[in-house]
Amino acid sequence: MKVKMLSRNPDNYVRETKLDIQRVPRNYDPTLHPFEVPREYVRALNATKLERVFAKPFLASLDGHRDGVNCLAKHPKSLASVLSGACDGEVKIWNLTKRKCIRTIQAHEGFVRGMCTRFCGTSFFTVGDDKTVKQWKMDGPGYGEEEEPLYTVLGKTVYTGIDHHWKDPVFATCGQQVDIWDEQRTSPVCSMNWGFDSISSVKFNPVETFLLGSCASDRNIVLYDMRQATPLKKVILEMRTNTICWNPMEAFNFTAANEDYNLYTFDMRALDTPVMVHMDHVSAVLDVDYSPTGKEFVSASFDKSIRIFPVDKSRSREVYHTKRMQHVMCVKWTSDSKYIMCGSDEMNIRLWKANASEKLGVLTSREKAANDYNQKLKEKFQYHPHVKRIARHRHLPKSIYSQIQEQRVMKEARRRKEMNRRKHSKPGSVPIVSERKKHVVAVVK
């Protein structure tokens, strides 16, 4: 008689150790799982709710300045070090790990208008209202030595900004004009200007390092080529631009922080139309900085908040504020893309998480898998009304909330007025102008 025996491979169902997870046989035939999509929807809804529950972005407040914080600079080689300059001429170097000030320098008389670090991280530069450019050692003075700059350059006019080249021992300052300096010389290698108004900010391109951009008080954004020592072209906007920041991953793109409450992302090859207009702030935007990934940027505003924008979206994905935080003057995104620092005029530097609900520290493999799965579910169901409503909801201060409502009413009134004018005018006499083209006055080459 023939007997058929059942044989199973124990490797398919037996755990190697008792600490392993039990292996569960699964059949992925969709006919056996008729409620797969409703189950995923519930999981996406729960994941979105939990994201808002665990959204605790504020990490620390670094206090020690005796006047408002006017500028920040990152250390190019160390994630733990950050430099800050105040309105009383004081520069502090902070250790973010210990959340303590490790060094204080009385650098200038009056405001510290700008500061930048050398690309190798051995020294940093500051400019102030006392018409001087100073270079300082990143490491403190030795025992018995006095705190003195490596060298000092006395200029003829007040310098309002400074930035260092990403590869060469060259830096640029701005004021009445844009000056290019060699570190070994006490006079500018070349000077460039276009117009007669003062220039408030200058920034080197991190990819095409010979390019730099500046913004002037006559509403211009001017681009320069350091090889030709001449301006390339400029774009004139309706209102003044406070600062610009280049995208670290896309060589031709930069974002401008404007006085008209908006930010504009431009492609320098086609300046007549912005790539994107970023709208959400309710007061002048004072500073902007990109994440190292180039996918997002953070903006600081006079409305006492900071916002995180995706590069390709016109609305912010996150807004950070506290009860004590006043006008935010400067903001930086750390080099590991995990944290954001902002300095405000009530003398504090605040440290935030870039992702408000992110768990800090080392994650287990199961936690990583669960996070990835939840993220995919939220992306899949992001346009469903309940998921979208929960994900977008933010608590705002009363001042910002009321200003948002006021701006909404004003925008609707302008739109209605334009429609009525078009309705009662000759066809074609009142053209339809897109939001992106409204704010650009002219491009000059």
UniProtKB/Swiss-Prot annotation:
PROSITE patterns on file: WD_REPEATS_1, WD_REPEATS_2, WD_REPEATS_REGION
Key words, A-Z: Acetylation, Nucleus, Repeat, Ribonucleoprotein, Ribosome biogenesis, rRNA processing, Ubl conjugation pathway, WD repeat
Phenotype reported upon loss of the gene: Knockout embryos are arrested at the eight- to sixteen-cell stage before compaction causing preimplantation-stage mortality. Mutant embryos are morphologically normal up to the eight-cell stage but they do not compact, fail to develop into blastocysts and die at the morula stage. Oocyte-specific knockout females are infertile. The ovaries of 8-week-old females are significantly smaller than those of wild-type females and are devoid of follicles containing more than two layers of granulosa cells and corpora lutea.
Tissue spec: Uniformly distributed in trophectoderm cells and inner cells mass in blastocyst embryos. Expressed in oocytes as early as the primordial follicle stage. Endometrial expression increases during decidualization and is highly expressed in decidua.
Region (Required for nucleolar location): 353-441
Per-repeat ranges for WD: 64-104, 107-146, 149-191, 194-234, 236-276, 280-319, 323-362
Stored InterPro entries: Sof1, WD40/YVTN_repeat-like_dom_sf, WD40_repeat_CS, WD40_repeat_dom_sf, WD40_rpt, WD_repeat_DCAF13/WDSOF1
GO biological process, one term: oocyte growth
Record GO terms (molecular function): nuclear estrogen receptor binding; ubiquitin-like ligase-substrate adaptor activity
Functional pathway: Protein modification; protein ubiquitination
Complexes and interactors: Component of the DCX(DCAF13) E3 ubiquitin ligase complex, at least composed of CUL4 (CUL4A or CUL4B), DDB1, DCAF13 and RBX1. Interacts (via WD40 domain) with DDB1. Interacts with ESR1 and LATS1.
Free-text function comment from the UniProt entry: Part of the small subunit (SSU) processome, first precursor of the small eukaryotic ribosomal subunit. During the assembly of the SSU processome in the nucleolus, many ribosome biogenesis factors, an RNA chaperone and ribosomal proteins associate with the nascent pre-rRNA and work in concert to generate RNA folding, modifications, rearrangements and cleavage as well as targeted degradation of pre-ribosomal RNA by the RNA exosome. Participates in the 18S rRNA processing in growing oocytes, being essential for oocyte nonsurrounded nucleolus (NSN) to surrounded nucleolus (SN) transition. Substrate-recognition component of a DCX (DDB1-CUL4-X-box) E3 ubiquitin-protein ligase complex that plays a key role in embryo preimplantation and is required for normal meiotic cycle progression in oocytes. Acts as a maternal factor that regulates oocyte and zygotic chromatin tightness during maternal to zygotic transition. Also involved in the transformation of the endometrium into the decidua, known as decidualization, providing a solid foundation for implantation of blastocysts.
Record protein name field: DDB1- and CUL4-associated factor 13
Organism: Mus musculus (Mouse)
Gene from which the chain derives: Dcaf13
